[in-house]
Amino acid sequence: MINKIDNIQTDSEIHMKKCIKNFKTNINNIHIGRISPNILNNIRVDYYGISTPLSQVANAIVEDSRTLAITVFDHQLIKSTEKAIFMSDLELIPISYGNTIRVTLPALTEERRHTLIKMVRTEAEKSKIAVRSVRRIANDKTKILLKNKEINEDEEHFFQNEIQKLTNIWIKEIDIILAEKESELMKF
């Protein structure tokens, strides 16, 4: 019985850590001073009717601190690649030159800073929801153990408190990362 609870707790912690890792990855794609090919990680291109990650249909390299050169592998995908970049929430404007698409990072205005901060806050909220979802799943599993009389009510209550402590720790971690990123965005 205790072993099952430990497994649930361990699994919950692993999933919560993954939520934090995904959050860090997502906000690290939000750059302000220097452009990086990673900024394109979440962009998907219509590849003959299939939504495909941009990295699988093109190669992006840094030309200078504010410009990316994207070489599309299949010449027929240039228009759909341009459209995917333009339609993303990154506010990038793609310009094609033959098989190459150039993307320039927009100038960082006060309005752009606030837009980026909103994006980071949205990602933070999504991550908090994901952590809380892990908590809910763990609590549901303990309720099943209680229902099956594998644990008693005291054990269920204790375990739910432990999961809540974990949830609080990871949500606080998200808040710390968010504050650091907001500070970084306001410095530039």
Curated annotation (Swiss-Prot):
Alphabetized SUPFAM superfamilies for the sequence: Ribosome recycling factor, RRF (SSF55194)
GO CC annotations on file: cytosol
Q: Which CDD domains match?
A: RRF (cd00520)
What biological process terms from GO does the record include?
A: cytoplasmic translational termination
UniProt keywords, alphabetically: Cytoplasm, Protein biosynthesis
GO function terms (MF aspect): ribosomal large subunit binding
Q: What does this protein do?
A: Responsible for the release of ribosomes from messenger RNA at the termination of protein biosynthesis. May increase the efficiency of translation by recycling ribosomes from one round of translation to another.
According to UniProt, the name of this protein is Ribosome-recycling factor
Q: Which gene encodes it?
A: frr
